[in-house]
């Protein structure tokens, strides 16, 4: 009897470990909110790269419903959004040294706040708190002419640097980025 219980326990443990290994190796591109990346070339081999998961609107009201207004949001889906710069830059006027960061936002009707957190490896909305903030900057909010189904982060280049844009539903939040 003890041998049977030991065998069943061993098989159960083996099955659990197999399931965890399979889950860890799943194809992230098949998720409902697949991974996406935006890169801004600063010149001289230096860049800013944002890795995020791109949820879909699917007919839902996004801001004020799926994404609450006035509260910290993970800015995408799944793992927290990463922001990596290989150069000294400014984001919304705040200095950001080379490194890897997590970004969060606080969406609101007329103004968003971009939070650049020194703590990385977060999952979802696990905002580590203001003690981990490198910077908090205001983002300009505007309306898009046509709704955007897939949450998107992109960069526009300008004569003085560029702009990071966050587009979803009918809203664009943007912030200036420049090389220091």
Where would I find each of the regions flagged by the language model?
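Mid-length scaffold segments of soluble, non-membrane domains
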Residues: 73-122
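Bacterial N-terminal signal peptides
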Residues: 9-19
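Polar low-complexity intrinsically disordered regions enriched in Ser/Thr and small residues
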Residues: 15-17, 67, 79, 127
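Primarily secretory-pathway and cell-envelope proteins
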Residues: 25-71, 120-180
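Positively charged n-region of N-terminal signal peptides that target proteins for export
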Residues: 1-7
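Alpha-helical interaction segments
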Residues: 12-13, 63, 90-92
């Amino acid at each position: 009897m003890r041998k049977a219980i030991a065998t069943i326990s061993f098989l159960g443990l083996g099955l659990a470990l197999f399931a965890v290994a399979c889950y860890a190796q799943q194809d992230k591109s098949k998720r409902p909110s697949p991974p996406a990346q935006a890169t801004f070339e600063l010149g001289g081999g230096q860049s800013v790269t944002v890795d995020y998961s791109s949820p879909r609107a699917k007919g839902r009201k996004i801001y004020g419903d799926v994404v609450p207004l006035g509260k910290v949001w993970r800015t995408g889906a799944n793992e927290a959004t990463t922001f990596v710069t290989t150069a000294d830059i400014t984001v919304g006027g705040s200095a950001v040294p080379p490194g890897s960061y997590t970004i969060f936002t606080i969406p609101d009707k007329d103004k968003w706040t971009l939070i650049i957190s020194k703590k990385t490896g977060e999952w979802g909305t696990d905002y580590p708190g203001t003690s981990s903030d490198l910077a908090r900057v205001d983002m300009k909010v505007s309306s898009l002419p046509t709704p955007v189904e897939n949450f998107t982060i992109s960069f526009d280049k300008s004569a003085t640097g560029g702009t990071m844009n966050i587009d979803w539903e009918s809203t664009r939040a943007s912030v200036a980025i420049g090389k220091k």
